């Protein structure tokens, strides 16, 4: 059973998350902020943490770039959910591959563990992340040899669609790739809910598209 909750801004879609997963009180979340560690703007990391804690969840932070594979494996297996924050998608993918955390995350998801991907964390579920190059700099991941990602879904999530300061660049990405890729653009108030092969995009006020 594949359970994915993909979003641009978790704090803005909390009601959608509680609809998607209601059994939250006292559960533990492996919180992976790795993508944000090479960025200057990181307010969303604390905002995501606080939103989770308000739901009664216990947050266990895990920076895969600085931990051993044994520690990463034990943490991912022990906790109930996996949450991957935003930041630089290329650096995130590089570190997941370098450490082997990518395979561990895929194993946990295959076993039914809920994965929450915010911004970069949503983008890496795509088959390949080359489409996000104009929003994120690949230069922050010099050891990354290819852009093949987790391939959990057959579409490409584009976060922050039509939101400032990404309005023009997200529109351009859609225009450039819409014919060659299966694009799923979402605003900060939308989330993509995936249960096995069922994929639904929802707006935080209850509308679907």
Swiss-Prot record:
The active site is at residues 119, 160. One of its GO terms (molecular function) is serine-type peptidase activity. Its EC number is 3.4.21.-. The keyword GTP-binding does not apply. It comes from the Bacteria. Keywords: Hydrolase, Protease, Serine protease. It is an enzyme of class 3 (hydrolase). Gene3D superfamilies: 3.40.50.880. This is Uncharacterized peptidase Lin0382. The lineage of its organism: Bacteria, Bacillati, Bacillota, Bacilli, Bacillales.
């Amino acid at each position: 059973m594949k359970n994915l909750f993909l979003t641009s801004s978790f704090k803005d879609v909390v009601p959608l998350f509680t609809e998607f997963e209601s059994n939250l009180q006292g559960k533990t979340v492996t919180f992976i902020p790795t993508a944000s560690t090479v960025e200057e703007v990181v307010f969303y990391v604390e905002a995501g943490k606080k939103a989770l804690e308000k739901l009664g969840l216990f947050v266990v932070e895990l920076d895969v770039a600085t931990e051993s594979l044994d520690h990463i494996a034990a943490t991912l297996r022990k906790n109930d959910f996996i949450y991957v924050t935003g930041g630089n998608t290329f650096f995130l993918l590089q570190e997941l591959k370098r450490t082997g955390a990518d395979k561990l995350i895929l194993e946990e998801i295959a076993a039914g563990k809920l994965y929450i991907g915010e911004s970069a964390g949503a983008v890496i579920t795509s088959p390949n992340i080359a489409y996000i190059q104009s929003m994120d700099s690949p230069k922050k991941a010099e050891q990354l040899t290819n852009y093949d990602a987790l391939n959990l879904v057959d579409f490409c999530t584009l976060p922050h669609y039509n939101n400032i300061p990404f309005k023009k660049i997200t529109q351009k990405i859609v225009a450039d790739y819409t014919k060659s890729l299966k694009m799923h653009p979402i605003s900060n108030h939308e989330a993509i809910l995936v249960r096995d092969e069922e994929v639904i995009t929802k707006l935080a006020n209850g509308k679907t598209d």
